[in-house]
Amino acid sequence: MDIHQILIKYWGHTEFRPLQEDIITNVLEGKDTLALLPTGGGKSICFQVPALAKEGICVVISPLIALMKDQVENLLKRNIKAAAIFSGMTHREIDITLDNCVYGNYKFLYVSPERIETDLFKARLEKMNVNLFAIDESHCISQWGYDFRPSYLNIAKLREYKPDVPFLALTATAT
């Protein structure tokens, strides 16, 4: 399916909003991209559509459990396979979720910046067919990365595991 067919099938829209198609095209061309769109501007579609257009899984780094759960719920309502790993899950639940990602049972995996630093995640990441790293609310890198959540500064280390996978940073509030 091309990106327009994906947009119609899963979201019921016939046209992209301004800049969405340009961002999606950049991602599909394998380019690292910064998407600066207003709140309500459809940032999620900018990583969801290209991830659905390609083989593999999109790893989404998100700052808040509530955001992860909301995104996963919205994808599941559209019959798109997605999962999130967050604090409070048992080791077994995390292990099963990551295995399902390795075996191609999900198109989207939502994780926190802290999760990507764990040995278990790194080991499974090497085995995943990742098609995109999406950093949602990427302004948190500079706002929180230097003191409150230093794990944000280590997101770039994912490049060591998947050097050919593009990164898409999304925000409404970059300054």
Q: Where would I find each of the regions flagged by the language model?
A:
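Conserved pre-motif I regulatory segment
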Residues: M1-P38
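Conserved nucleic-acid-binding Ia/Ib motif block in the N-terminal RecA-like helicase ATPase lobe
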Residues: H4, C58-V60, I65-T118
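Walker A/P-loop
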Residues: G30-V49, V59-S62, L168-A174
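Loop/turn-to-beta-strand initiation segments
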Residues: D32, G56-V59, K81, N105-L109, ...
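Conserved helix/coil segment N-terminal to the catalytic DExD/H
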Residues: G41, Q48, M89-L132, C140-Y146
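Conserved coil-to-alpha-helix start sites within the AMP-binding
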Residues: K43-C46, K54, I65-D70
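Conserved catalytic network of the ASCE P-loop NTPase/AAA+ motor domain
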Residues: A51-A53, L75-K77, D99-G104, A123-M128, ...
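Post-DEXD/H (motif II) to motif III coupling segment of the RecA-like Helicase ATP-binding lobe
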Residues: E126-T175
